[in-house]
Amino acid sequence: MAAKDVVFGGEARARMVEGVNILANAVKVTLGPKGRNVVLERSFGAPTVTKDGVSVAKEIELKDKLQNMGAQLVKEVASKTSDNAGDGTTTATVLAQAIVREGFKYVAAGINPMDLKRGIDKAVTALVEELKKASKPTTTSKEIAQVGSISANSDETIGKLIADAMDKVGKEGVITVEDGKSLDSELDVVEGMQFDRGYLSPYFINNPEKQSALLDNPFVLLFDKKISNIRDLLPTLEQVAKAGRPLLIIAEEVEGEALATLVVNTIRGILKVVAVKAPGFGDRRKAMLEDIAILTGGKVIAEEVGLTLEKVTLADLGQAKRIEVGKENTIIIDGSGAAADIEARVKQVRVQIEEATSDYDREKLQERVAKLAGGVAVIKVGAATEVEMKEKKARVEDALHATRAAVEEGVVAGGGVALLRAKQAVGDKVKGDNADQDAGIKLVLKAIEAPLREIVNNAGGEASVVVNAVLAGKGNYGFNAANDTYGDMLELGILDPTKVTRTALQNAASVASLLLTTEAMVADAPKEEAGAGGGMPDMGGMGGMGGMGM
């Protein structure tokens, strides 16, 4: 086992804070409407230019082991926030840095770190409550567009595209982001359905970049039982192979010899097949298979209606224009089902929604309507160069997550204002059990100004002046860094999803507390560089060459 370095107390924390600062300083330059770009090196091809906090954080690995530990913990804040809320990664990183920086001073002054942590937790709980109280539901398409624009770094066209997409497929509809073919971004709505089952074997993948299997113009076989014997499938496979088209098999389970044979045929390129499990369970599974059958114009092969696998003809199979199968999702795009049949099915499910007694059943039925009627909206991102396209696509994906979060939990005033108002509302209400906990509460209430300060710094303003001006105002009064003016943030359309602000604060405090309560760090000791092999004598004698009378 390699030797380890163990570092204690103040020295350990100081090295860790250096790492936190390096990562946070690189991430926070992207915050706000006047945030800058960060260029990331790629091992091949052009560098990536981004204004997305989590993309920057993910790239950072530091040489110093102890600094790197601090940086990796803050990276966790960014990626956790990205996973939960889809946006707010830069805000979370800035908050984490501020809490660590303030907290570090207190710990150095001899305050108990565990009590400090308890104080931080109390303050965060109170602030989250205030954020929830201040939250306002998003109802209009305009508000959704505003949330999207802010998240896409003040790009109004992106916000509008997302709002249009949500209008067309409904708030429960499926929205995907793809590379466009032209300079402008555009919205494409495709009839389709998504369900939460992915491929049964990774060997079905034919698009390694997206880690998915794409089938163009495939047949769809729907079977309500397990398939383990390949002989049952052979008649269908032979007919599909003759037609020269791919096949998607949706069954309760495909296992053993049947799955192995399908995989081998796919790898050898004899037949393009993908197998997935049927979505749902029990009666719901039957209903969803029936939905897919109606959407694709096929039949569910079930013994109770007198159909068996051996007797299947191509007429019994559904068809679609394209099917994408990922690790956890399958999207059927442009099924061949008759519009009248789909409409009748939607009506039937809507009647069931009215009769449903439990909220859970109602929610599941509404999901089915969204899948049958909603379709899939595809946002095609256009740009002049591939580098710009990647950067823009990342922003569109961020904005999409933010708008979903806004629909879920509502919105608060953006630009760091909601946090300041929550701070004012909490004021002196929250008390710790002792002076050390009070210090933790005070620390969070000071650190919470950091996002607004950073937005102002990036816009070239004087942070303290702006923070005091905003604190002097009331309600949604805040600072618009895009044009250096003050006003009502909601009226100006500067909104943040409550979920994003809340998640950023909670994750930042959680990781910052861990850093502050650290007392020792263990890392691999740096390897000693061995000297030149073979014990060569030193060349000191060469210095006398000056006297050779040259």
Curated annotation (Swiss-Prot):
Together with its co-chaperonin GroES, plays an essential role in assisting protein folding. The GroEL-GroES system forms a nano-cage that allows encapsulation of the non-native substrate proteins and provides a physical environment optimized to promote and accelerate protein folding. PANTHER family: 60 KDA HEAT SHOCK PROTEIN, MITOCHONDRIAL (PTHR45633). Its main location: cytoplasm. GO terms for biological process: protein refolding. One of its GO terms (molecular function) is isomerase activity. GO terms for cellular component: cytoplasm. This is Chaperonin GroEL. It holds the Pfam family Cpn60_TCP1. It is found in: Cytoplasm. PROSITE patterns: CHAPERONINS_CPN60 (PS00296). Coiled coil: none annotated. Signal peptide: none annotated.
